[in-house]
Amino acid sequence: MKKYNIETNCIHGGYRAKKGEPQVPAIAQSTTYRYYDGADMADLFDLKEAGFFYSRIGNPTVGIFEDKMASLEGGVAGVAAASGSATIYSTILNICQKGDHIVSSSSIYGGTFNQFKVTLPAQDIEVTFIDQNDSLEELKKAIKPNTKAVFAETLSNPGMEVLDFEKFRLLADFAKSPLIVDNTLASPYLCRPIEHGANIVVNSATKWIDGHATSMGGIMVDGGNFNWEEHKDKYPGLVEPNESYHGLKFYETFGDAAFAVKYRVHILRDLGFTMAPQNAFLNIQGLDTLHLRMERHSENALKIARFLEDHPEVEWVNYPGLKSSKSYEAGQKYMPKGRGGVLTFGVKGGSKRAAQVLGNLELASLVTHVGDIRTSVLHPASTTHRQLSEEDQIKAGVR
């Protein structure tokens, strides 16, 4: 099949209407699907055949969104979920169980930080946070024999640090573990982590993918580039016989897509973090204009960052498109089309003065969100990262 550029794939990737089919994917608002042969149903439940039988596990509209995102990220398969947080949680649980360990950059979204610091340890999954700016040799000290994953964000929220993919790929290789990258703030238009060594990519589709603040959603894309068989002692759930499916072996049966299939028919089946068809439809509409929006968002953010950098009442500005940013060079390397639509800045006078600025806004909206076509503003320390201690806020890039 001919390869198209990413701008074309935003519109056409993952879905081509056949004769008589709708040009715009339809909403399959149904929980279940009719069959006329019991043997056909049995084959679906045994994973011998692909198809839809219950919308907790798969839905035609959601499936189109999954295929489109897999195409955009350059992976072998995608699985959608109800939110970005549900996606990250499910991704970790797909390879981790009681007694396991993961390593994560500390410069991550507050909800993810809390999930890793509070929720996972409550299930006896240990998380070690690292400073992603440390040397590779220093980062290696965090790796343990039971380390199952290395996690980071392409563009950290709200630290605005562009990930050094080369360094983190080497760290994951040292750990003999997959590199999981949250691509939310960049989107697959500005960066494709799999091309830079990531094995699994997650996105909160609620943000730039939807782009209009209308729907919740998350998506995991399996890069299909981690050899689970080579590390079978570490990842038995993907290699050894699965009790739920009468001894089926995911990697042996599904090859490069093993992680995605297990995620769907095991984790999504049991936890039910299912994306609604209506939300999938809205996210599909968002993808049609993703390339145009991300270009303009990046242009606008850079203009605002430059304006604020010269403003006498502004203490500092953090945006990887500025030459003053410590991530400027990494941004040029990994995000050449633009640095995204989010920036952070500090006003002189501290939090009290910041509150006054927020109260004086007219056009920009004070909301708990990024990724909207409308300009949004937020004070992370008192909102998205409020549950973190002051020390953890600093680690996460909140000033």
Give each language-model segment a name.
Residues 1-59, 67:
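N-terminal "arm"/small-domain region of PLP-dependent enzymes with the aminotransferase-like
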Residues 7-16, 78-310:
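Conserved PLP-enzyme active-site core in the AAT-like
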Residues 18, 34-38, 227-228, 290, ...:
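Short, acidic Gly/Pro/Ser/Thr-rich loop/turn segments
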Residues 37-86, 111-119:
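Conserved N-terminal alpha-helix of the aminotransferase class I/II PLP-enzyme fold
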Residues 50, 76, 279, 283, ...:
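Short amphipathic alpha-helical segments
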Residues 72, 308-312, 361:
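Acidic-histidine catalytic/liganding microenvironments
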Residues 294, 302, 313-399:
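Conserved C-terminal alpha-helix-loop-beta "cap" of PLP-dependent enzymes
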